[in-house]
Amino acid sequence: EGQIAVRLMKRFSLPYEVATALLAKANLYLKRDAKNREVVYGGRSYEIPTKEFIEEVKAGLDDLCELVGRFLEECSGKELDSKPIYVSGEGFAGIRGALEHMSKRLSCVCEQVAPDLPYYNKPSMSSRIALIDMASADSRASGSLKRFLNIFGG
């Protein structure tokens, strides 16, 4: 989301907060002749043409797809050809059509990762939950919590 928001900032001279607000409501399925995209932020209204907005979002997704495609060409073997690519939901949760666009561009299935936890099974939470899980795993492996649990045989 951040890289695409920066593209929007540069192209349309928007503050970062406005660019992320526009991305949160992005829909790649909109007809190109749809009315302009509008966001009100800080008492000011920002309006950009839908066609250019969609083109810029797709261009940002294409840049990401190029990086992933290059990685797959250089680093993957045959075992990865039939497996899906999992995308964390934080940046893509609000962009309708992003996964489909990436799937077409990469010629493979792209799926959104969502943790299997009650109330946290939203794709938008997957990046945060993954970081929390990683941090708590490190803490359990080497921190004072491990020493404390070892006292009780845990």
Give the residues covered by each predicted segment.
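Helical "lid/coupling" subdomains associated with nucleotide-phosphate turnover
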Residues: 1-21, 28-154
